[in-house]
Each structure stands twice: as C-alpha cells, then as structure tokens.
C-alpha cells in the first residue's frame, strides 16, 4: 500500500522583496544611461522637444469632440445613467452606502473635468 502525503502551501517561506530594493545603484546607473542621451538631444534641439513651431494637428476634430461629448450630447447622459445603475446594483449587492453615493462624486468629477477641458 502506497501512502501519499500532500502538503498545502509553500514548502519554504518565500521572502517578499522590498519596494526600495528596485532603487539600487546599478538600476540608477541604467536609468541615467537611458535618460541622459534623450535629455542632451532635447537640449540641442528644443524646437523638436517643445513643438514650438508646430501646428495643432487635432484642431480639425475639435468640433466633432464638442458635438459628441459636449453639454447636450447623449453620450454624457448615457454615462451618467450607467453610473447610477452601477451604483445602485453595487449598493444592493454590498449594502454599502459608499457605492450608492459614488455616482454623485463621479458625476461631479466628470462635470469639473469637462469644464476644465472646455466641453461645457
């Protein structure tokens, strides 16, 4: 008769690496070796780095974006409706009031964000 012994879990404790172990001297040298050439190129060619002489390639789509996501668009209404439905369902599932009030907070963030970018 053969008996099988099974062990659940790891056989040896696994030590978790610290977040700060990524900031070693060797990793910082590798980062500097990658960043310094780009910084030197931007210093010698600032017009390419800052696009000082360029034209706005997205200006032609500005009216389309305002029509799609503007003040009276149906996309905004559908997003708000989806927020309300998801908040209600999550509240019913968890009985946590945070989910119920979450749609109001997200709606405020969306309204402020649209005002900042000029869509309202």
UniProtKB/Swiss-Prot annotation:
Which residues are on the Cytoplasmic side of the membrane? Answer: 95-98
Record-annotated disulphide pairs: none
Q: Which residues form the propeptide?
A: 1-51
Q: Which residues carry this modification: N-acetylalanine?
A: 52
Q: Does the keyword Membrane apply?
A: yes
Q: Its quaternary structure? A: Monomer. Interacts with itself to form filaments; also interacts with TraQ.
Per its record, how is this protein called by name? Answer: Pilin
Originating organism: Escherichia coli
Q: What is the lineage of its organism?
A: Bacteria, Pseudomonadati, Pseudomonadota, Gammaproteobacteria, Enterobacterales
């Amino acid at each position: 008769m053969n008996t099988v012994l099974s062990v659940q879990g790891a056989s040896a404790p696994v030590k978790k690496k610290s977040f700060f172990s990524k900031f070693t001297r060797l990793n910082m040298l590798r980062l500097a070796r990658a960043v310094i050439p780009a910084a030197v190129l931007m210093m010698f060619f600032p017009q390419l780095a800052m696009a000082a002489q360029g034209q706005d390639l997205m200006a032609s789509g500005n009216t389309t974006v305002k029509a799609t996501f503007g003040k009276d668009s149906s996309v905004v209404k559908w997003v708000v409706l989806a927020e309300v439905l998801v908040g209600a369902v999550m509240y019913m599932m968890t009985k946590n009031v945070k989910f119920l009030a979450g749609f109001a907070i997200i709606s405020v963030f969306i309204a402020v964000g649209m005002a900042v970018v000029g869509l309202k």
